[in-house]
Swiss-Prot record:
Location of the protein in the cell: Cytoplasm
GO molecular function, one term: phosphoribosylformylglycinamidine synthase activity
HAMAP family, A to Z: PurQ
Gene that this sequence comes from: purQ
Keywords assigned by UniProt, alphabetized: ATP-binding, Cytoplasm, Glutamine amidotransferase, Hydrolase, Ligase, Nucleotide-binding, Purine biosynthesis
UniProt keyword Nucleotide-binding, yes or no: yes
Name recorded for this polypeptide: Phosphoribosylformylglycinamidine synthase subunit PurQ
PROSITE patterns: GATASE_TYPE_1 (PS51273)
GO BP term, pick one: 'de novo' IMP biosynthetic process
Oligomer status and interactors: Part of the FGAM synthase complex composed of 1 PurL, 1 PurQ and 2 PurS subunits.
Annotated source species: Enterococcus faecalis (strain ATCC 700802 / V583)
Its EC number(s): 6.3.5.3, 3.5.1.2
Amino acid sequence: MKLAVIVFPGSNCDADLLWAVKEVMGIDAEFVRHDATSLAKFDGVLLPGGFSYGDYLRCGAIARFSPIINEVIRFATEGKMVFGTCNGFQILTEIGLLPGTLLRNDSLRFICKSVPLKVNTHTKFTSEYPENVSIHLPVAHGEGNYYCDEKTLKELKEKNQIVFTYQEKVNGSLANIAGICNEQGNVLGMMPHPERAMEELLGSTDGRSFFASIIKNFGKELSQ
């Protein structure tokens, strides 16, 4: 299994993401620039956090026009794994791979802290977490307030697409949503950073089971 970590102008969590999957989890991975046009040698895509293109207009609005995005969309439509954290989540909503949008935090302040999360373990991204587990992951964002219309929220609930839920008030997100997946289950976006919770020295290892789930479920599909 080989993963691509996409690097946009303004990305600042790309190194964290590469370190987490490659050095800690032992997954083959490498950086891919935003202006690349092929992901032919990769099996999955990771969109990192940061401030792509300075977050001008709105978060992810300019990144959606990067040449690599066409390949990311192709990956998703072919059922391959696509994951976006923080700014990566914002980009996934901008390009239409995930429903809804991310608004300014209701406090109008940047939030940087560890938050408790409820995990839906019945997804390919979370199957290695114990049932009914509560985990802690860092967040660091100014625009993480998830919003969608009532019809979309109803569908997210009915189709088991809400993957991570805040267990306390964090940013005003509708239904306390912290992360969602697409209906097919191969695309996930979340505001918290699992790549920053990989070592006890950093305060938590709760992110490891997230990447272990990716290895088990998406890696298994490649070997079949």
